[in-house]
Each structure stands twice: as structure tokens, then as C-alpha cells.
Amino acid sequence: MAPGQTASRPDLEAFDYATRTPFKAVAKQLIDILGAKLVAYIAGVREARAVQQYAHDNRSPRHPAIEPRLRLALRVARFISQHDSKEITQAWFMGLNPQLDDRSPARLLREGEIHEVGPEIVAAARAFVVGG
């Protein structure tokens, strides 16, 4: 298998894609899947206009934690949206998730340390996709 190929592992494909994609495209695709308001919430910015600027105007995030948050959000959003609709993916990010002690993935991404909450969120997404 050639480097970068992930065979039949959509979770690995989503990881590879979110890691290699330029940040501008990360923001644009997240907006397409989750909507600008939810992406702004995850990023921890006050206005959806800021994430629109990340996607369209070459604006860089002011806080260094924003890019890793949005890359992880894209990884999970792509993985879930390969199996469900955008609406289901949005609901998954906003809903109280029993795999996450009834906390929403969006809130964890916004407020948590990515190295702590990231593995929990990825595991919850895998459980959701496998379990429906």
C-alpha cells in the first residue's frame, strides 16, 4: 500500500486528511459540515465572521489552540459525515454524549486541552459510528 493510503479505515482517512489539509480548507470544510456558528463556538471566537475569514480571507487564528481544535473537529466531522448526514453530524457535536459523561463534543473541544479531550472525542465518534 502506498504512503497516505488508509484502505478501509475511514477514521484513519479522516485523520490523514485533517492533518495534511491547509488550514484555510479545514475551516472551509468545517463550515460546510457544521455551520459557521458551531465552528466559531468550537474555535472559541465570538463571531462566526472570524471563522469565515479563516476560510476565505487568509486570516490566521490569534490563539495557538484554535488550529488544533479545528483540525480535530474536521477529523471527527468527516468521519461521522461519511456515515450520516450533516444534520446528524451537527447534532452529534452539540448533543450531550453519554460516551463523554453527558458533555457535548463541541464544548469539550472549546474548553478542554486537546491532548486530554481529543482521544475521548475520537473514541466517542468511533462508538457512535459503530453503534449507530
Question: Which residue ranges define each predicted feature?
Answer:
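Non-transmembrane "mature" sequence context
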Residues: M1-G132
